[in-house]
Amino acid sequence: MDITLTIFAQALAFAGLIWIVATKIWPPLLQAIEERQQKIAEGLAAADRSQKDLAQAQEKVNEALKDARTKANEIIDQAHARANQIIEAAKLEAIAEANRQKDLAQTEIDASATRAREELRKQVSVLAVSGAEKLLKREIDANAHKALLDELAAEI
């Protein structure tokens, strides 16, 4: 065999190999590579969307926490205000009850004082009548009168 014929046969075989590879092997290989690239691109896009969704969810969570803290502070403030109102109402009620008890005690004291005065008037009137009887029974004497009046004053 001649070298030219050998080179020509090899060139023909190589061209046949290239044609087989280009028509039968290369298109499915390119299709597989493109599908893989598309899947990778979709995965990257999904990862980007997931990161954006995560960031949005984190913002929503932070906003919800902020709202919850605000509402909790409002509830705490309302509770403090209500507690202060209850305390103030209890103070006013206690003051009113103390004043009522004081008024009752004062009324009782006044009644006792009135009864004591009446009792003293009765006793004074009895003593005055008794003293007048003694004065009238004795003889009229300035020293005796003075002694009786001193005795009455001591009894009163």
UniProtKB/Swiss-Prot annotation:
GO terms for cellular component: plasma membrane; proton-transporting ATP synthase complex. One of its GO terms (molecular function) is proton-transporting ATPase activity, rotational mechanism. Gene3D superfamilies: 6.10.250.1580. Keywords: ATP synthesis, Cell inner membrane, Cell membrane, CF(0), Hydrogen ion transport, Ion transport, Membrane, Transmembrane, Transmembrane helix, Transport. It comes from the Bacteria. CDD domains: ATP-synt_Fo_b. The chain crosses the membrane at residues 3-23. It is found in: Cell inner membrane. It is a single-pass membrane protein. Pfam families: ATP-synt_B. F(1)F(0) ATP synthase produces ATP from ADP in the presence of a proton or sodium gradient. F-type ATPases consist of two structural domains, F(1) containing the extramembraneous catalytic core and F(0) containing the membrane proton channel, linked together by a central stalk and a peripheral stalk. During catalysis, ATP synthesis in the catalytic domain of F(1) is coupled via a rotary mechanism of the central stalk subunits to proton translocation. F-type ATPases have 2 components, F(1) - the catalytic core - and F(0) - the membrane proton channel. F(1) has five subunits: alpha(3), beta(3), gamma(1), delta(1), epsilon(1). F(0) has three main subunits: a(1), b(2) and c(10-14). The alpha and beta chains form an alternating ring which encloses part of the gamma chain. F(1) is attached to F(0) by a central stalk formed by the gamma and epsilon chains, while a peripheral stalk is formed by the delta and b chains. Belongs to the ATPase B chain family. This is ATP synthase subunit b. It comes from Xanthomonas euvesicatoria pv. vesicatoria (strain 85-10).
